Amino acid sequence: MINKIGVLTSGGDAPGMNAAIRGVTRYAIQKGLTVEGIIRGYEGLLSHETRPLGRRDVGAIIHRGGTMLRTARCLEFKKKETQKKAVAYLRELEIDALVVIGGDGSMRGAQALSRLGFPTITIPGTIDNDMMGTQYTLGFDTTVNTVLESVNKILDKIGRA
């Protein structure tokens, strides 16, 4: 039975990550679960940087850029021993399942945890839109539209040719 979940963002940040954190947290609380936010992704997991997340913590984050949990890349996480340490710490925190939001490297990390028997679910979040199994990743559409809007503003400013 799942009573407590962890949520982390890893790799490069992408628009929509805060909305995903908010959605995961609110849904979990609605279902009676406790949520632990892991700061700075897998790097923070290894250095034991966590904080409980409640409704108030995620209430006003939906329109902020980046990720409230911050993010980092963690080359150390490619090692099996490091992955085992991460699972041990998750169990020490009494986290029953982990939600990972990020790109391809984040997904590989989540897959490694899953192979070690730790329940993990992923939300693809990358501006690159280069993930198999999904047509659009979290952050891609916003990024494309922001670039398009910026280009149009520049063209308007200089006078369209």
Model-found features: residue ranges?
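Gly/Ser/Thr-rich loops at beta-strand to alpha-helix junctions
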Residues: 11-15, 101-108
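Short, acidic/small-residue loops that bind anionic groups at enzyme active sites
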Residues: 36-39, 114-137, 141-144, 148
